[in-house]
Amino acid sequence: MRSNRILLLAALLMGCAARVPEVAIGPLADGLDAFLAAHVPADENIRADPVARTETASYHVVQVRDRETPHRHAAHDLTVFVLRGRGALVLGHTRIPLRAGDAVLIPRGAAHWFVNEGRRRAVALAVFTPPLDAADAVPAGEFD
């Protein structure tokens, strides 16, 4: 009877474990761990790697060690899917806590920045619409 309770408790705890988001896009189809192992940021605070593109969007894996500086994208809407880690996105005057599995839409022109609150790099899939062809980050004041 006691062993049945232990098995039931173990099964319940496994069901409560956080699920790691999976991404089946381009080079990520073989697994995020393999991709990250091949794309380790040396001493970079932020590393962004393009992973796919369509006529209407471009897809990038972004790794953040510490934080972004406040900025805006003049010509792109941005959708961010957090794949690993946790942190806070400051969007305008609003602080949005984010962790793996969360998503957020950042409209073009909106001042924003991400602050990593974990011990390891935060990793996200960033989707730019229209596709990102050139640098589009324009510095923005903290409460711009």
Model-derived features: positions:
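A short, N-terminal "cap"/entry segment at the start of jelly-roll beta-barrel domains
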Residues: 16-61, 139-144
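Ligand-binding loop in jelly-roll beta-barrel domains
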Residues: 108-135
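Conserved short histidine dyad/triad with adjacent acidic residue
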Residues: 58-74
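Short, conserved beta-strand element in jelly-roll/cupin
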Residues: 64, 74-89, 127
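Bacterial N-terminal signal peptides
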Residues: 7-15
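Short acidic-glycine-tyrosine-enriched beta hairpin
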Residues: 94-108
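Bacterial N-terminal signal peptides that target proteins for export
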Residues: 1-7
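Structural motif
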Residues: 58, 86-88, 95, 111, ...
